[in-house]
């Protein structure tokens, strides 16, 4: 058997196969109702939606900003990767920050950092390369909230399970993934439409008005979206000290009693 055949054999045989009994399967309609009843879960999804809307929407048009507004082709690749580079550097300290101030406050801090830095880039001397490096490095600090969305979603699911005895992890994460893709698609289209509304088209001469539209789409609009994403975080209320510890203790105790009852 060749290496390729072994690879596919391992891939096929090592897949986890879970068979869900018909009586244990929930209805999609009921699952959606449960999600709509879970305020904190909805807030987490909206936060992730706006975060992806601003971040990935900007990525789709940022290259035009560096080409036509900054007008420096030498550093385009670095500028495009700056957020990821800074995010990789600060990732080791992220858990300590989250542990100290909590997921919600870390997410709010991240949105503020990203929103403020992009608006400063919008109004500032963006043709100055040193200025761009500093602002984009600050913008990259927004990566401190990387795991916060998933953590808050799990907390919301656990809290709902504790209160109502029902959890729908699968549907919640499926909707979250879909919402992220929808946000990316809408943002990409919307920001390009804004550029087109200011007269941008391939091969046209760059006028100050067109550059203004590119700057608006690449910096101001994503910055505003990040600020809007703070609103659902202000409504989210599962970050009270010790609250989730109590929730998990009750869930663990309930599951323990359930297992003991089943073993009898």
What positions do the PLM features span?
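C-terminal ends and interior cores of transmembrane alpha-helices
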Residues: 113-127, 132
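A membrane-interface helix-boundary motif in multi-pass transporters
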Residues: 4, 193-224
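Juxtamembrane helix-start elements in MFS-like secondary transporters
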Residues: 72-80
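A late C-terminal transmembrane helix in Major Facilitator Superfamily
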Residues: 166-198
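Helix-to-loop junctions at the C-terminal end of transmembrane segments
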Residues: 89-103
């Amino acid at each position: 058997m060749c290496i390729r055949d072994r690879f596919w054999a391992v891939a096929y045989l090592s897949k986890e196969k879970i068979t869900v009994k018909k009586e244990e399967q929930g209805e999609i309609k009921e699952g959606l109702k449960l999600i709509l009843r879970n305020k904190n879960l909805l807030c987490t999804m909206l936060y992730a939606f706006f975060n992806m809307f601003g971040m990935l929407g900007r990525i789709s048009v940022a290259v035009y900003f560096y080409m036509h507004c900054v007008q420096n082709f030498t550093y385009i690749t670095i500028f495009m990767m700056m957020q990821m580079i800074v995010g990789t550097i600060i990732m080791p300290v992220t858990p300590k920050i989250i542990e100290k101030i909590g997921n919600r406050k870390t997410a709010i801090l991240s949105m503020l950092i990203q929103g403020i830095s992009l608006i400063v880039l919008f109004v500032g001397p963006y043709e100055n390369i040193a200025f761009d490096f500093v602002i984009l490095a600050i913008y990259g600090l927004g990566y401190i909230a990387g795991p916060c969305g998933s953590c808050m979603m799990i907390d919301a699911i656990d809290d709902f399970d504790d209160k109502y005895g029902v959890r729908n992890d699968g549907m919640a994460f499926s909707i979250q993934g879909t919402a992220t893709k929808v946000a990316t698609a809408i943002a990409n289209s919307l920001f390009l439409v804004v550029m087109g509304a200011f007269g941008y088209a391939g091969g046209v001469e760059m006028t100050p008005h067109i550059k203004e539209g590119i700057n608006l789409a690449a910096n101001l609009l994503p910055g505003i979206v990040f600020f809007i994403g703070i609103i659902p975080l202000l409504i989210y209320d599962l970050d009270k000290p010790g609250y989730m510890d109590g929730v998990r203790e009750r869930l663990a105790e309930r599951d323990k009693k359930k297992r003991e009852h089943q073993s009898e």
